[in-house]
Amino acid sequence: MIALLTGKLAYKSPEFIILDVNGVGYQVHIPFSTYYTLPVEGGALSLQIHTSVKEDAINLYGFRTQQEKELFQLLIGVSGVGPKLATGILSNSEPSELADSLVNGNLARLSAIPGIGKKTAERLVLELKEKMKKLGLAQPQAGGTTAPAKQEIRDDVLSALINLGYKEAVVQKALAELKVTEDATVELVLKQALKILMK
């Protein structure tokens, strides 16, 4: 099984990258949390890898941190959650926010993630609550967690997109088209902004 790849970033997109390792190009699926930390194409890159083996395909999923990889592996261990949905969950929620939602049973926030209904959210909490506590990512709170301020989210997304090479004026225009909700996360708004910028 491939657990780590180090090489040069040959191509990147919000859904997958191609990593050149000694002349061999590996297609690696990634969450947005990994995408917006990538170097420019041609830059050096090392990714933690989860290898998914099926009868008809072998897919690689890459993460910048071991923590994200462990979260991904916990998610796909839940009945009804496959690699694609797990990647989507990580794309729409930061690790600490996801852990908080699971530990505190925040079904509303979990259900707001695309692809997750109430039943799946309940199953995630039931199966992962104690495991999240052991990872030490969450900060249990009696009243649940407080969503990041809307302006703080916009500022973080603006900074991330500028680092990706987009001009500030173009990003500001894209952000003006978005409606940031109370339960929004940086990853979710980033994903929405990228859709607008890539039209």
Curated annotation (Swiss-Prot):
Region annotation Domain I: where it falls in the sequence: 1-64
Pfam families named in the record: HHH_5 (PF14520), RuvA_C (PF07499), RuvA_N (PF01330)
Chief place of localization: cytoplasm
SUPFAM superfamilies (alphabetical): DNA helicase RuvA subunit, C-terminal domain, Nucleic acid-binding proteins, RuvA domain 2-like
Coiled-coil positions: none
Domain free text: Has three domains with a flexible linker between the domains II and III and assumes an 'L' shape. Domain III is highly mobile and contacts RuvB.
Source taxon at top rank: Bacteria
Record-linked SMART domains: HhH1
Subunit structure: Homotetramer. Forms an RuvA(8)-RuvB(12)-Holliday junction (HJ) complex. HJ DNA is sandwiched between 2 RuvA tetramers; dsDNA enters through RuvA and exits via RuvB. An RuvB hexamer assembles on each DNA strand where it exits the tetramer. Each RuvB hexamer is contacted by two RuvA subunits (via domain III) on 2 adjacent RuvB subunits; this complex drives branch migration. In the full resolvosome a probable DNA-RuvA(4)-RuvB(12)-RuvC(2) complex forms which resolves the HJ.
GO-annotated cellular components: cytoplasm; Holliday junction helicase complex; Holliday junction resolvase complex
Presence of keyword Translocase: no
Organism name: Citrifermentans bemidjiense (strain ATCC BAA-1014 / DSM 16622 / JCM 12645 / Bem) (Geobacter bemidjiensis)
Region (Flexible linker): 144-148
Record carries keyword Zinc-finger: no
Region of interest (Domain II), residue spans: 65-143
GO molecular function: ATP binding; four-way junction DNA binding; four-way junction helicase activity
Gene Ontology process terms (BP): DNA recombination; DNA repair
Localisation: Cytoplasm
Role: The RuvA-RuvB-RuvC complex processes Holliday junction (HJ) DNA during genetic recombination and DNA repair, while the RuvA-RuvB complex plays an important role in the rescue of blocked DNA replication forks via replication fork reversal (RFR). RuvA specifically binds to HJ cruciform DNA, conferring on it an open structure. The RuvB hexamer acts as an ATP-dependent pump, pulling dsDNA into and through the RuvAB complex. HJ branch migration allows RuvC to scan DNA until it finds its consensus sequence, where it cleaves and resolves the cruciform DNA.
Gene3D superfamilies: 5' to 3' exonuclease, C-terminal subdomain, DNA helicase RuvA subunit, C-terminal domain, Nucleic acid-binding proteins
Family: Belongs to the RuvA family.
Region (Domain III): 149-199
Protein name: Holliday junction branch migration complex subunit RuvA
Keywords: Cytoplasm, DNA damage, DNA recombination, DNA repair, DNA-binding
